[in-house]
Each structure stands twice: as C-alpha cells, then as structure tokens.
Amino acid sequence: VTSHSEALPLTIKQIDSKDSELKRSGAYQLTIDPKGIEIAVSDSRGLFYAAQTLQQLAQTDGQGNTTLPLGVIKDYPDIAYRGTVEGFYGDPWSHADRIEQLRFYGKMKMNTYIYGPKDDPYHSSPNWRKPYPEKEAAQIKDLVKEAAANKVDFVWAIHPGLDIKWTDEDRINVLNKFGMMYDLGVRSFAVFFDDISGEGAKADKQADLLNFLQKEFIEKKEGVSPLIMCPTEYNRAWAGSDYLDVLGKTLDPAIHVMWTGNS
C-alpha cells in the first residue's frame, strides 16, 4: 500500500453483510483485485486485523518489489475471548516480556491478556489490599496502553482468597483496589478464587462479593467490560455439585465464569 501517484486505491468502509459472523467485533472482509484493495470492517478492531493480514500476505522479492495475491478473505472470530492468562507460579514475566507478548497477540488477532501472576504480591496475598508501588503502577499503565494499541483487552485479576475475611471491610478493600486499577487505565477486571481452600473457597461468600462488585463497580464505572471470575472448582473433575449449584443459583448472570472443561 503506497501513496505513489500510480498506486491503486485502498478503500475502507463499514461492512454491509447479512452474515451475522461478519458483524462480530474484529470481523472484516478483505478484497484484493486488479483495481485495488477494499477493506470492509465491523469496527476498529476489524480494521486492525485486516492490516495484520495485509502485512502477512505481502511478499517481497530480491529486487525489493512487494506483491499481494488477488482474492477475497472473510475473517471473523469464533471465540469471544482469545488470548492468555499469566496466572502461573514462579517468576512472573518481565515487563519487556509482556510488551512483546501483547504485540504478538495483536499480530495473531488475539484479543485478551489476563494479568494474574500468582507471585505478584499485589495481585494476591499478602498485598492485594494495597496499591502498587510507583514503579509497578507505571508499568501497569504501560501495559494498558500497549494492549490498547494492539487491540488487546488488558484484564487485571485479583486473587484474594488465601486470606480474605468475609467482612464489609474486605469487601470494600476489593472495591477500592479495583478503583486504584481503574485509575491506572484498566477497564477489564477478574476475580480469581483458584488454588485455595477453607474459608475463601465458600461459594456463597464468593458469589456475594462478586455480586457486590458487579453492582457497585462494574455497573457504575464507564467503559468497563463484563466481570470475569475463576471459581475454585473450575472443571468437572474437581467440581462438587454443591459448590456449582450455589454459584448457579446466586451469581449475577452478567458475570463471566472461567471453565476448563472435564479436566
């Protein structure tokens, strides 16, 4: 694609299709023919993805001439959340690693990065109630900006279940921590209750906290994505009917629940 006087036109327009798939966020139709290039998109994410495809299709020969194949590509996502969870134990990724990951996700049309390294003490115990120090807070801001530039939703997760007290004070502590992260630019949030036992693993208490956050934060803050939760029992092999029944009956249906399947 060039601005040279002899260049063929590049046309960008809103997609006009009866196909419901092409109306999903990130969908696009790319047409390359002898008359030029036309990109029809559903939203800005679709335009970004079409640009990635153009770059991936371009071939440059030994003389520096770049060509594109002729054809029509209809591309749309089948899965709403496409990405990774940094939720492992051990040394977390470095800041540079995360930046590199976010750029890779954009190129591969992945739209979700969930920040939840278990060895980040401000994500989990003992410091989940406290604000991030200045350096780490600045890095979170950088990650949010880089994610947005690559059309990736940066989801910040909290993991309070190891030492949470089911009190009004700790409920407000979670709410306040979400507010701190919102002020750093975060607009997507998750609560993780995995890898815990005892008091923190009570389904009714978890649902009560999540419903509180849904009402007092998610529904009140501008531009916030649906709340995500990871249950303590997140697959069929580990899950007891009592735990899942409580969540199913009491959890606000607007909250998205992570589930890994049979195992």
Where are these regions (language model features)?
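Contiguous, structured surface segment used for ligand recognition
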Residues: 1-79
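Short coil/turn connectors at secondary-structure junctions
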Residues: 7-8, 34-36, 79-81, 110-111, ...
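Structural motif
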Residues: 13-18, 40-44, 87-89, 231-234, ...
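Short, solvent-exposed polar/charged micro-motifs at secondary-structure junctions
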Residues: 19-22, 166, 237-241
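A structural signal for isolated positions on well-ordered beta-strands in alpha/beta enzyme cores
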Residues: 38, 155, 190, 226-228, ...
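Catalytic-core regions of glycoside hydrolase
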Residues: 62, 196-263
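Substrate-binding cleft of carbohydrate-active enzyme catalytic domains
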Residues: 84-86, 91-225
